[in-house]
């Protein structure tokens, strides 16, 4: 499954290991989209499990009608989680400004009593704490036939890595300690990840540029990411990711009943890993791709066709993947769909 934010890659290293976090934050999102079948070829050729796209309003396409805001508080007793989110979007002359932020803290979460690796009876998953915070700011300029905007976001997160803790029995501690102190003990006794990410995105759109096209959209993203896996106060392994991504998409008018979009996708990524568990070699990846998605509705059937051609270079090796996909959905009624 590929995770994107506003149609651009999440920019983390979560696909490399199950204990690497996804950096796309859903608590301040406007909506979450799920794509399967031919539509996934707009985003890449390897998303066989689908694409999850998190959409926010940091770069607004329309005026919000004055000032609009949100706030939220959340928590639970299983991990003593405490979460707060807030955001505001405001019109100012021909521009729209946006700011949002979140903070989240939780200790080790409760679980049915089980015997751990040391043979002890415990009722919580050791080293499962999370401390995270982030903020984002964006501005867009709206004109008669489109928009242009930029956003910047920063995320910082520390989270425990369960399953890697080993007790020093000369320094046993009480397993019934309060949840709000769980992450403090875990920092000292078990490995955890210390993560940060900076993200810049630029979006632009041009409506009705010609008789053949409804809209042309440009999206660019730059991401700088790092996380360190820390044990006994020492950074054992450091992972880094810097990437540039550009997507140009043109949505065309109906042709023989078929609507759709075609475009160009550029991706440049430099991934690094150093330390005791750096099992993935450093790599530099560059991709150029062209894609086309077609869709047609006929009575209760929705037909989709997708194609993508890529020129991929990983270090000194080159590849030319070619992908095609076909899908159909049958609408049985308002509640049921059959897809193939």
Where are the regions a protein language model picked out?
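Membrane-embedded beta-strand positions of outer-membrane beta-barrel proteins
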Residues: 69-73, 99-101, 139, 150, ...
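Transmembrane beta-strands of outer-membrane beta-barrel pores
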Residues: 73-79, 92-94, 103-107, 143-145, ...
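Structural signature of Gram-negative outer-membrane beta-barrels, strongest in the C-terminal barrel
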Residues: 141, 259, 278-340
């Amino acid at each position: 499954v590929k995770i994107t934010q506003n149609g651009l890659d999440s920019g983390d290293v979560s696909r490399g290991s199950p204990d690497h976090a996804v950096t796309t934050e859903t608590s301040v999102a406007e909506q979450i989209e799920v794509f399967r079948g031919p539509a996934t070829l707009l985003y890449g050729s390897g998303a066989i499990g689908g694409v999850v796209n998190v959409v926010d309003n940091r770069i607004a396409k329309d005026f919000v009608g004055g000032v609009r805001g949100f706030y939220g508080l959340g928590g639970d007793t299983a991990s003593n989680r405490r979460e707060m989110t807030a955001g505001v979007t405001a019109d100012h002359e021909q521009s729209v400004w946006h700011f949002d932020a979140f903070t989240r803290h939780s200790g080790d979460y409760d679980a049915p009593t089980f015997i751990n690796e040391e043979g002890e009876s415990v009722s919580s998953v050791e080293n499962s704490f999370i401390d995270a915070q982030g903020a984002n700011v964006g501005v867009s300029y709206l004109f008669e036939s489109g928009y242009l905007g930029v956003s910047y976001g920063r995320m910082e997160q520390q989270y425990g890595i369960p399953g890697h803790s080993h007790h020093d029995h000369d320094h046993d501690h009480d397993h019934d300690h309060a949840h709000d102190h769980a992450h403090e003990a875990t920092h000292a006794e078990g490995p955890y990840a210390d993560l940060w990410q900076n993200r810049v995105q630029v979006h632009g759109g041009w409506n009705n540029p010609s008789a053949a096209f409804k809209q042309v959209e440009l999206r660019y993203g730059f991401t700088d990411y790092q996380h360190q896996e820390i044990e006994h106060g020492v950074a054992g392994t450091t992972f880094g990711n810097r990437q540039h991504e550009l997507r140009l998409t043109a949505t065309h008018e109906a042709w023989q009943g078929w609507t759709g979009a075609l475009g160009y996708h550029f991706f440049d990524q430099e991934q690094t890993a150093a330390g005791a568990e750096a099992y993935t070699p450093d790599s530099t990846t560059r991709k150029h791709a062209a894609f086309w998605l077609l869709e047609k509705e006929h009575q209760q059937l929705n037909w989709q066709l997708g194609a993508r051609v890529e020129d991929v270079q990983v270090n000194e090796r080159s590849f030319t993947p070619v992908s095609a996909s076909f899908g159909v959905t049958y609408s049985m009624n308002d509640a049921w769909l059959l897809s193939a």
